[in-house]
Amino acid sequence: MLVVSSPFTRLLVCFLLSGLLLVPSPIRSEDATGLGQLRTISLSKLDSLLPPGTHVLIERSAIEAFLVALEGAPPDWATVYGQGHHDPGHDERLFNLNRDRDVAREGNPALNWHMAFIWPGELSQFDPDTKSYTVAVGPAFNVTGWGMVRFKPEEFPSNLRVRPNKKLAALISRSLAKREKAEVVVVMAGVLIPTESIIYDFSHEEEGVGLIMPVVRVEQVEVVLKPHAR
């Protein structure tokens, strides 16, 4: 039993306990060693890995339905863009769009959706000590009737690694030895951040194309080996 014998000690204990309460929840889908399991499940069966009620936002129709529920209608991209980045009013119009949309979505139930999205990835460096592979991940750009949609994790594990079973490990090793890619899909699930949940911008690759970035607080990461890599 803990005995607190002085005002200073009591203050210190309270401080330490409050610090523990403020530690953020870790991203799940890891074993006791901190390594994720390499999955071979079909993307159509992702529900089995995710919490009940998760909205899987992979298909264009699902992404557009999410945007309709949260934002109502697409912005008038042509008006916001004007004459482009060199237009004197371009930045102000884009700022106003983001500000007005932030206000309009306040209290919208879709802000509380638990959702999942995917980014493409590849397995690369093998660590013989942990028998795991590093996962290199890049963003995915989804073409929709609203513009380009890129889901953006608020934070992402800086050293994502997965451990395949023995059969998969042998297959992946042979593929990499032949300089073939071992492609994966990185599934991220979580909820939108409470403020500035959606960022509106323009594509840096295609002139005048609108870019929508939902910002997600990631709570779960799953790595799925692509079928042709099995």
Segments from the language model and where they lie:
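Bacterial N-terminal signal peptides that target proteins for export
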Residues: 1-13
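Bacterial N-terminal signal peptides
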Residues: 11-22
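OB-fold and OB-like single-stranded nucleic-acid-recognition modules
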Residues: 27-230
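Serine residues within intrinsically disordered or low-complexity segments
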Residues: 5-6, 18, 25
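Residue-level detector of alpha-helical hydrophobic segments embedded in or interacting with membranes
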Residues: 2, 19-21, 209
